[in-house]
């Protein structure tokens, strides 16, 4: 059974059992700062399980895209070396929110596996929590499962919990037995870590609420959460004991093999093939969901995975940019399940190619540093300073270095690496991840927001946080988080950044950098205490930075006007895809398939500025969600709204009507001026506009005018003529470049004639091994081709030095390729000058970084003849 068929059969089966199908969500968790990526199907329903959210259904089924790389669930280091670890996988799951429980969950799982998929009953094994007699009785007495194939396991294996406190419960796992020919024992046995018994389905019965004292309080409404890896199930059904041998990976594996030099032994690089096949899956989908390579957070996880894949490609002998070439193969594989990948393919290819080109510049240098360190090792551990230098200077993620070390049966000095890292850590990171438990919220209370009406207020301090822990006081110079009873500070939400400002009284001053808000309603004021000692219970004056707030309000209101104008000019298919509003600028992402013309940009700008000049009042209404819909108020797709919503109306004839919790101007004239500074594509079908308002927009216009005046002076024209004048210059430049190309070709031809005089005869073979002066690396191949034609039979080695780098070309005429291969001669020379290359028996190209050894290297070619 094909993977696509399994995926659909699972959804169809549970839909027939009254489950609502939930499409796979983004890999980026919605409104959840505790996770870098969605790593299980239940992540979509965390708030439902914890009682924070209610859905219009009580049964759900999903096939969720997941990533496990970074954080608590990190499979990255195992990928490639095992049969079943992946950074990206699909999780099949069925869920009950207070509807059915253990009996139905077990029955559905059993029926789906044995009747829908026809798995042999005798090949299955089950585990239950050691204290869960109920689940075991259902398996034995109602399903008829043999007791001798049930393992009772402890908390580590068969008890699930969301966190240190909160929803939790026992689980029952279903395993598949691959047979006696594979080593390993059943769950709960000493040899359970073998590959014979493989877990395929985990049924979690969430029936308790774990208290802070460890007590398990029964939930009033127990739930079911199950998870089954699609790749593992496909391996079972396709009679493979390695996930990478299933149909879902074969097109990728073939593409990787085709990219690998024929001389390379693929069998010796199976791990590398698996690494690359896995990593293109996770990286492509991360990019589709809006992640870009960076040096922190999700972006750094993406960068680590891309670079690990690239390194394994180089290990297999792939010396060209290759990783992005696998994206179209992947898009074809998932064209029906996830068509969004095909839609975003140009962006995926662009991001992957750019990242590989960037890393390729330092990969070879970093590998040389690492090879030198390994050569000079006294023991079996690579020192922390070297590991850090690879990370900091050459862009080697720590797990990539660890990966290479493991291949050499070495380890890395993590303590030494961490010591070096501490010197670079930002003080702001001391605050760490912070979450007040539900129990503490009940005791402390939530923050009352006053910021719509006022920018300052007096409040008591409810709680203080330092180094991720609740504390009683914060001292001068320390970074921390302050929780207030009432606050005028707006907390980051809906694309609008949180407020900054000062919390103070006669003795203390706490500078607030930014403000966040937890789902519970607790406002977190992040910052540093400049003077005094701040204590829980103190009374302070909270003062929002007024200038910053006014700038933010201008930009936020302008964003609403922009959204409305886009829908009028481009059509109502325009929907918001994301936004950023801060004190300096606004950024707005929206759905649209084409580049916006200059004419349309002018229309949009003009429309918005006319609304600003109209200076109408901005109206705010708190109304029922149904009434808001009747007013055609724009709501953000994917956002969850309460029954009562805040509606902002701007301009005559209700020009803009949107649901919004942000802060805004009182009159549209307060925006002052609106100017679009850029329009670009973000991904397939998504465009981005960046803009300025107020004095920032005026300064932008002023700079543009000054630049135009400077160009006019340089081109000896006035502002009205400058475009025509620059167009003439560009045309002239193009004509000159064409003439230069003609002259270069003539020069190249003449150089070939000049070099014939340097040809030597070595053992009756014509040999030319020399530096070509006044040429570029691009010219060498043409010169070599002309020399081969003129000499008839020869070995030609040409080099050129530019900016302390050597370019090499080796040409061998066809009659000599059985005795002398260009690629072997090239690598012989390149190794002596710190480089490498590649090519065919008759023509090869490469280079090096040590020109001081070039003369000796060229002279040594004679010894090969």
UniProtKB/Swiss-Prot annotation:
A molecular function GO annotation: ATP binding
Cofactor note: Binds 1 zinc ion per subunit.
Keywords (A to Z) from UniProt: Aminoacyl-tRNA synthetase, ATP-binding, Cytoplasm, Ligase, Metal-binding, Nucleotide-binding, Protein biosynthesis, RNA-binding, tRNA-binding, Zinc
A GO-annotated cellular component: cytosol
Residues annotated for Zn(2+) binding in this entry: 556, 560, 660, 664
Protein family: Belongs to the class-II aminoacyl-tRNA synthetase family.
InterPro entries for the chain: aa-tRNA-synth_II/BPL/LPL, Ala-tRNA-lgiase_IIc, Ala-tRNA-ligase_IIc_anticod-bd, Ala-tRNA-synth_IIc_core, Ala-tRNA-synth_IIc_N, Ala-tRNA_ligase, Ala_tRNA_ligase_euk/bac, DHHA1_dom
Reactions this protein catalyses: tRNA(Ala) + L-alanine + ATP = L-alanyl-tRNA(Ala) + AMP + diphosphate
Assigned EC number: 6.1.1.7
Localization per record: Cytoplasm
Cofactor requirements of the protein: Zn(2+)
Role summary: Catalyzes the attachment of alanine to tRNA(Ala) in a two-step reaction: alanine is first activated by ATP to form Ala-AMP and then transferred to the acceptor end of tRNA(Ala). Also edits incorrectly charged Ser-tRNA(Ala) and Gly-tRNA(Ala) via its editing domain.
Key word Lyase present: no
GO BP annotations, alphabetical order: alanyl-tRNA aminoacylation; negative regulation of DNA-templated transcription
A Pfam family that the UniProt record links to this protein: tRNA_SAD
Gene name as annotated: alaS
Protein name: Alanine--tRNA ligase
UniProt superkingdom: Bacteria
Keyword tRNA-binding belongs to the record: yes
HAMAP family: Ala_tRNA_synth_B
Domain remark in the UniProt entry: Consists of three domains; the N-terminal catalytic domain, the editing domain and the C-terminal C-Ala domain. The editing domain removes incorrectly charged amino acids, while the C-Ala domain, along with tRNA(Ala), serves as a bridge to cooperatively bring together the editing and aminoacylation centers thus stimulating deacylation of misacylated tRNAs.
Listed Gene3D superfamilies: 2.40.30.130, 3.10.310.40, 3.30.54.20, 6.10.250.550, Bira Bifunctional Protein, Domain 2, Threonyl-trna Synthetase, Chain A, domain 2
